[in-house]
Amino acid sequence: SSDLRFAYNLLEVCYYSVSDKKITLDIVKSINNTPNIFHDKDGDNYYDLLSAFQKSIRGSDVQASLYYLARLLEGGELEAICRRLQVIVYEDIGLANSSMGPKVVSACIAAREVGMPEATIILGTIIIEMALSPKSNSGESAIYNAINTVKNNGSYPVPSHIKKNNPAYKYPHNYKNSIVKQEYLPKELKGSKFYIPRENTFENKLKIIMENLEKINK
């Protein structure tokens, strides 16, 4: 029932609002008197907030990102926030700022360890950096390009020279710069490109590396 969900949400907010995790009647009364912070996890509003949160970060709107973070924090959604942030950093920031991945994971670990209210500072700080970071979804696009190829074409045979214990395999570390001309894709997919770099500083460097490697294998 809605009453049961409300009680559960209230208890969850109380739990994350006290550092020693000791919930008293006074704490429950205090949190319960805070207006308009709860949302029904089974209703549209909960998922609308999570959607708005991610889209604000993706859209590089730092003010909106902080606002929706505050809404979710006040609703006791620490776990949901941390899960969503770890998706966002790889889905929407990705290779445009690859150092953000470990930063976000570390921030989420720290937020969970210290709990509320101190987690607010940790998450607020990392959200600002995420929102203002350059963005790229090339990693997401690349893996789904590969998945769609598998779904649409089935499984082609692995080239014999890279099968296990095949003497025809050329061990790259035995060659200059650990690079040797050798085909790795099935012959039916030769020349396929799943990863298409976006225009940003880091991926421009990756593009040059990739193009140089492709020249070697021509």
Residue ranges: model-predicted function:
Residues 16-39, 80-85, 142-147, 160:
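Conserved C-terminal helix/linker of AAA+ ATPases
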